[in-house]
Regions:
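A generic structural motif
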Residues: 107, 116, 157, 183-184, ...
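Short, well-ordered beta-strand elements
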Residues: 178-181, 368-376
Length: 393
């Protein structure tokens, strides 16, 4: 399961989306050891990118469990998704291609984003990784049943110690992946531990696509954002006429589970209309970037990984707007995200390392910057990224 750009493990359904994206990235032309297994990869990729299905996904890791309701539709080359958390804080995500709207109904907060096509988000592959099966060996492991459906089982065995093995269950009728386990190293004489699991507990495949349900939600959120823009413009005009020392309405809000918002992130209060679902809209700024152009490079490449994309995101830290650089590296199956932000002694204290399920995190100071590396790989792999990163200017 890949680290989602800008989001933590609590982000709704992203672990499962990352699994589908990884399967979609797997090449079918590389030697997988079995012609039939290569054919299954083709089927899994097609089902993940062009199938219509809805169901409930359960994600378990680190002794905790969460579930998400998933609706996925494809119409031509257009992809539509709706995700709704079934546990904890109520959260909904609506996606049309790269346009993403995240809503916290109980807080009346919406985040409006256009997600860059970095690895690890969505179920549509952005490119094929021809070297993926240079890092993993694909093995067929028989049959099983998942969510009441017959499934073929496959193991992706890493060729080195820099990544984890993964076991996949694919629907025999359509090829859609029904379950994915990330497996830890096997202790001597014991079976491999399951670090985390994402699986459908129930699913309907081949449903009638309903893209309008997603588009209506996006239009409703965008209409609320447009109203807020108009009100902000009116307030700005009236504020110029006010005597010095008067202050207008607060223009910042911390969105639950998201970076703090500020005027730089365009978070504005909406009118107190009880019928409105959204009272606040946050637009985190984001732009594509080039790692070397931003002044960073890896002294040496981590074997099997290549740079898949790079963005700069705006967040608020301790009341101040901060730019965070994110670089995503892929080995064709899993991803590592590397974040760089300005170092602050009041926020960044000692170097640390953490684990939740298969996800490991390494954080450390590098000169005047703070580096965070996250991925579903062993901690030693993340340390290779952190050790190789250097400032060129």
């Amino acid at each position: 399961m890949s680290a989602s750009p800008g989001c933590g493990r609590a982000a709704v359904a992203l672990p499962w989306l990352g699994v589908l994206a990884r399967v979609a990235l797997l090449p079918v032309t590389a030697c997988a050891g079995e012609t039939d297994a290569r054919g299954w990869l083709e089927r899994m990729r097609n089902a993940a990118t062009s199938g219509n299905y809805q169901g409930t996904m359960v994600f378990s890791a680190g002794g905790s469990m969460s579930s998400t309701r998933v609706w996925h539709y494809c119409v031509g080359d257009q992809t539509f998704e709706r995700l709704e958390a079934q546990d904890g804080r109520h959260q909904r995500v609506f996606r049309h291609n790269e346009e993403v709207r995240t809503v916290w109904p109980q807080d009346r907060v919406a985040v409006v984003e256009k997600r860059e096509p970095l690895a690890g988000w969505g179920t549509t592959p952005q490119q094929v990784e021809p070297s993926a099966l240079e890092n993993y060996e694909l093995r067929a492991e028989g049959s099983a049943r998942v969510a009441g459906r017959d499934a073929a089982v496959f193991l992706l065995e890493p060729r080195d110690g820099l990544r984890f093995a993964q076991r996949l269950w694919a629907d025999r009728g359509t090829g859609l992946m029904l379950r994915a386990d990330v497996l830890g190293p096997a202790p001597a004489g014991a079976s491999r531990p399951v670090l985390e699991t994402a699986a459908f507990s129930e699913i309907e495949i081949g449903v009638r696509p309903q893209p309008e349900a997603v588009l209506q939600a996006i239009r409703r959120i965008d209409a609320a954002a447009a109203r807020l823009d108009a009100q902000e413009t009116a307030r700005s005009g009236s504020a110029r006429a006010e005597p010095p020392g008067r202050s207008g309405p607060a223009a910042s809000l911390r969105a639950p589970g998201r970076p703090e918002a500020s005027s730089a992130l365009r978070a504005e209060p909406a009118p107190a209309d009880e019928r409105a679902e959204v009272w606040h809209v946050v637009r985190p700024p984001q732009r594509r970037a080039d790692l070397e152009a931003e002044g960073w490079t890896l002294r040496q490449q981590v074997p099997g990984f290549r740079l898949a994309g790079c963005v700069v995101r705006g967040i608020e830290s301790a009341g101040q707007p901060v730019s965070v650089l994110q670089a995503v590296f892929s080995d064709g199956l899993t991803h590592v995200s590397l974040f760089v932000e300005p170092y602050r002694s009041d926020r960044h204290r000692s170097e640390m390392q953490a684990q939740f399920g298969a996800a490991h995190t390494v954080m450390r100071r590098l000169g005047e910057h703070w580096v965070t590396v996250i991925g579903d790989v062993p901690a030693a792999t993340l340390k290779l990224f952190a050790d190789a990163l250097e400032r060129r200017r």
